[in-house]
Amino acid sequence: GFNQVDKRWLKNYNELWNFPSELLEILQYFTGEKSPKIKNPKDKRRMFLTEFTKEEQEQVINFFIKNQALIVNDILKGRGQFASEWFLVILKIEKQDLKWLLKPINEVINFYSGEVLITDRGSLKIGKITMQRKGGDNGRISANMLQFKINPCELFTEIIKRD
């Protein structure tokens, strides 16, 4: 299943990636930091990327294409003295042997990187990474955080394909 690999407030991502002001505003509507600017949004708390104009959608896509290497590295590896060099996945399925794999982080970064697109559900895909509003949290403000998710089990299918 899917696992959250990074979750922060938009202002913290802005400190890392320096969003252009127009993009920052789009992402504020996306996370719900700002109330929707359109009539009859799918969700009264926020806007989905599919609800923005084509030009606004292109701004989002172009920024994440241009900065994909930096963004994926920050999300999966991190920065500074605690940056990860390895990626461990443990798979426990009922009534089956435990499986695990340990991969160099750069292989994992390459595996999860790829085409940047807006999904039909209004989130962003950066390769195999999903960017979405955190949501949940019973209406608490922390639902407005931005999160990135992956399915770590996909690394097991990559090994099977090569064998």
Regions found by a protein language model. Give the residues of each.
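Short, positively charged
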Residues: F2-D163
